[in-house]
Amino acid sequence: MIKKFDTTTQEVLLELEKTQKEFWNISRTTAEFLYNFIVDAKSQSVVEVGTSNGYSGIWLGKALKQTGGKLMTIEFYDKRLDVAKENFEKCGVADIITPRKGDAAT
């Protein structure tokens, strides 16, 4: 379990980790690295290209909650973006995340 997160977030992340290959999610090790990097750097603004199901966005959002920052995340597929938005809501980070429909080239 991820002791620094609430029970709901822990459960959501564990469920999303089961779909890591299907949704091309980053590994937990990478997620923890990014989380710590954002907190240590006191980042205020982060852009993520490739929202997928929201796994990495949850980690980034939780870190940015600590620093008072915000995340903009971009996803091409509507279905994945909708799933990510639901996961952001469940994990309490939707208020600092701006999800956008688009691709990396635009």
Question: What would you call each of these model-derived segments?
Answer:
Residues 1-106:
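A short alpha-helical cap/connector motif
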